Amino acid sequence: MVDEILKLKKEKGYIILAHNYQIPELQDIADFVGDSLQLARKAMELSEKKILFLGVDFMAELVKILNPDKKVIVPDRSATCPMANRLTPEIIREYREKFPDAPVVLYVNSTSECKTLADVICTSANAVEVVKKLDSSVVIFGPDRNLGEYVAEKTGKKVITIPENGHCPVHQFNAESIDAVRKKYPDAKVIVHPECPKPVRDKADYVGSTGQMEKIPEKDPSRIFVIGTEIGMIHKLKKKFPDREFVPLEMAVCVNMKKNTLENTLHALQTESFEVILPKEVIEKAKKPILRMFELMG
């Protein structure tokens, strides 16, 4: 099946982009594997006009927004993000009225419709940097409460998080899990995602996005790393650092990320169906806060 996918991909002129949380078999056939920001940037650099995206809906839509002239297809239309779907345009409008001077900073894990109402988009890799650079001591931030709290800690700014309890179910680790792995692997370094709750972040050695997690073993010579994010990241790290050991903090699985399989990836290439289509107005409005993010990052 892998050979058939690679053959069809070449024949039809597709580039395959996969998120770090995809199953190992899909990471291995992808032309590029990365976090949402890395994938969006990669898509902008491509000369190819056809992209098969392996991730969840908001990520594929982000690629389409930044590459409106390219054909973007996905293997499973139902692969979505529960956290992104918790934030609605109505909630954003409500908080804009309450805090008219506060810029709206939306995490990339948000719907395209919500992005049209944002002042700037951020990722888990650059959220702190983006908020620091905004000329405001108060920001409205959504939809991840834990990332919002982390940004508040690091910037000293007032961060109003929306919706009330926005969070990623996959990253709800227990701080006790860190105590347990430290007993089992006393020399290990613990790296967790900023979407984790504060008690977990506070006990970790490092807090970082999946893109940042990849860079830590380049600087830290430790032999064992405990990883607090979705299980797919372990495969990416093991491939990049075969001489190190990577242990999951807990068996955290994103069922939506795992909806993509070799079977439906092959089917997507065969039929070229499930194309990502967005209204022109949404593309134009959502693109502005994304480009603002790139501007702020320099």
Swiss-Prot record:
Top-level taxon in the UniProt lineage: Bacteria
Compartments it resides in: Cytoplasm
Cofactor detail note: Binds 1 [4Fe-4S] cluster per subunit.
Outcome (variant: residue 107 to F): Loss of activity
Chain residues that bind [4Fe-4S] cluster: 81, 168, 254
UniProt keyword terms in alphabetical order: 4Fe-4S, Cytoplasm, Iron, Iron-sulfur, Metal-binding, Pyridine nucleotide biosynthesis, Transferase
Effect of substituting residue 219 to R: No change in activity. Retains weak activity. Loss of activity
Catalytic activities: iminosuccinate + dihydroxyacetone phosphate = quinolinate + phosphate + 2 H2O + H(+)
EC number annotated for this UniProt entry: 2.5.1.72
Ligand binding (iminosuccinate): 19, 36, 107-109, 124, 193-195, 210
Name of one Pfam family that matches: NadA
Major localization class: cytoplasm
Reported function: Catalyzes the condensation of iminoaspartate with dihydroxyacetone phosphate to form quinolinate.
Family: Belongs to the quinolinate synthase family. Type 2 subfamily.
HAMAP family in the record: NadA_type2
Name of the protein in question: Quinolinate synthase
Natural source organism: Thermotoga maritima (strain ATCC 43589 / DSM 3109 / JCM 10099 / NBRC 100826 / MSB8)
Lineage: Bacteria, Thermotogati, Thermotogota, Thermotogae, Thermotogales
